[in-house]
Amino acid sequence: LFNEITRRNLDLTWDATNGVIASSCTDEVIAAAAESGCIAINIGMESGNREILKSVRKPGTLENFLGAAEVLRRHEQIHASVFLMVGFPGETMSMILDTINVAREMDLDWYRCAQLQPLPGTPIYDAMAAQGIIQETGDKELRFNGGAFGKQAEIEQGLRLATADFREAFANIPMDAVPTPDQLTDIWFFMNYHLNFHRIFHERNQVKMDQLIAHLNVLADVISPENGFSIYFLGYLEYLKSGSISPELVARLEQRLDTSPFWRDRFEAFGLSAEHLKDLNFPEDETQPLQLLSTNKAAPVSAGLG
């Protein structure tokens, strides 16, 4: 199919953001997809822990996911994303750290982080309800996650307001402990920032920067206009590309922080400020990505494969 699209010179672009099977991402297939106009692919990994993958009967393996990522990194014109979930029944902090470490080793463009919210009546829902991870509710009361920012509106409405120092947020949680629902929300937020936004400080590939600008414009204008991180890092990328930032974008961020205690707390915790955009002066110490949930440098996951 891809070769025929190319042969006919249809001059179109397409994406597979609903998800592809990792094992199908071979050099031959992805090269043909890119040539035919593919601009985005999403891999539905969910977890980077072997035990969790087995428990949810996920057909993909860590080898599949890392192999697919290696292929996709060779095709920079494809914006490659990964779907991650936290909050599986019995999932410990150590298992979540496995997911974070595999995601980091994949080193792709975006991670769609979400908390597991199963449908009532399913085995996984019953298991989570029995463990107290979720409360049994009627269908009308069940909250669905709208993606990477699906929780933000819920948090900001006062249903979840975490104000802890996020740089030390998980230091006192035992690695063999199953996080509480409140802790899971903090973990979800923290993962989303460090796997997606913080790494933008280190991006210098022009193709990837353009992809991120397009992605953040959609987030800031359509999907989650209230999200302060989207506005801040859109401004940062504008600065890298042109040496300036539009006054309108600066005003949007100032308005967001002025009206939202939630975002003021988060920006303070992560060392971010609207003044960075106004002064065109960003943190100078952003040279290495922060380690998550561990003070020790984790060995590459691939070192333990096979």
Residue ranges of model-derived segments:
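Catalytic-core helical/loop segments in enzymes performing group transfer/polymerization on anionic/lipid-linked
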Residues: 227-228, 234, 254-257
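"A position-specific structural signal for the A-helix of alpha-solenoid helical repeats
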Residues: 85, 233, 266-270
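TPR/TPR-like alpha-solenoid helical repeat scaffolds
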Residues: 263-304
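A structural motif corresponding to the C-terminal lobe/cap of the Radical SAM core domain
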Residues: 6-222, 244-258, 275-288
